[in-house]
Amino acid sequence: MNALLTNPFKERLRKGEVQIGLWLSSTTSYMAEIAATSGYDWLLIDGEHAPNTIQDLYHQLQAVAPYASQPVIRPVEGSKSLIKQVLDIGAQTLLIPMVDTADQARQVASATRYPPYGERGVGASVARAARWGRIENYMAQVNDSLCLLVQVESKTALDNLDEILDVEGIDGVFIGPADLSASLGYPDNAGHPEVQRIIETSIRRIRAAGKAAGFLAVAPDMAQQCLAWGANFVAVGVDTMLYSDALDQRLAMFKSGKNGPRIKGSY
């Protein structure tokens, strides 16, 4: 029988190790595999803002499977039915967006666990996650390999952060800088001093609660700052942004009047 896969990403978070990631928004398995050969610790495959279908996510999971980079799937929302599908195609680590309350966090955690610990629907014999029924006792042991991360990205979520951190089954909390800054009254300005202060205090609160703290920083200096504050899973770029910047930079070498890449401070 096939052995249940371990989750190196979750194990490293448990140990407090720093993991550097990359955001994948290009929606193709080809680009995902290129990224997986680069050496990033983790790759966020985005189903919220990138136009990924379940089948697209499935193909990208297949593409990165032979490599050391660990995939994290972000579905468009945290419904029980969508979480079930994403887990069944083999995702072991989920990042659920827009979690504002402890009750939402509990519902999401329940959706990732089989009964009696949760409400995940049973279908292991037709699921890639269970190797189509070939992993012995899959349902009994799968919880240990699942990693659940939730996004805190609104003023409401910040007000409820301590309660969210207390929810059993939540392994880490990710600060969403773009939506958070907009919610705080500073749209498209995650670098505002007040937003920066709140990001710092939030990261420190998350780590003090014994949870992993995550962030996406497309500016290298911001990534370094978040690491200094204690964030231990940080994405340092977005594939589509890096690609467009490289295209602009190359064209500017050969066409007069063309500007190089615009420096972007946020996602």
From Swiss-Prot:
Q: What cofactor(s) does the depicted protein rely on?
A: Mg(2+)
Listed A to Z, the keywords are: Lyase, Magnesium, Metal-binding
What are the protein's GO molecular function terms?
A: 2-keto-3-deoxy-L-rhamnonate aldolase activity; magnesium ion binding
User: Which organism is this protein's natural source?
Assistant: Shigella sonnei (strain Ss046)
Signal sequence interval, chain numbering: none
User: Which residues make up the binding site for Mg(2+)?
Assistant: 153, 179
PANTHER family attached to this UniProt entry: 2-KETO-3-DEOXY-L-RHAMNONATE ALDOLASE (PTHR30502:SF5)
Residues annotated as the enzyme's active site:
49 (proton acceptor)
Tell me the name of the encoding gene.
Answer: rhmA
Q: Where is this site: Transition state stabilizer?
A: 74
Q: A Pfam family this protein belongs to?
A: HpcH_HpaI
InterPro entries this protein is in?
Answer: Aldolase/citrate-lyase_domain, HpcH-HpaI_aldolase, KDR_aldolase, Pyrv/PenolPyrv_kinase-like_dom, Pyrv_kinase-like_dom_sf
Q: Point out the annotated site residues (description: Increases basicity of active site His).
A: 88
For binding substrate, which residues are annotated in this chain's numbering?
151, 178-179
What is the enzyme's main class? lyase
Q: What is its EC number?
A: 4.1.2.53
Q: What is this protein called?
A: 2-keto-3-deoxy-L-rhamnonate aldolase
Q: What does this protein do?
A: Catalyzes the reversible retro-aldol cleavage of 2-keto-3-deoxy-L-rhamnonate (KDR) to pyruvate and lactaldehyde.
Transmembrane region positions?
none
Report the catalytic activity. 2-dehydro-3-deoxy-L-rhamnonate = (S)-lactaldehyde + pyruvate
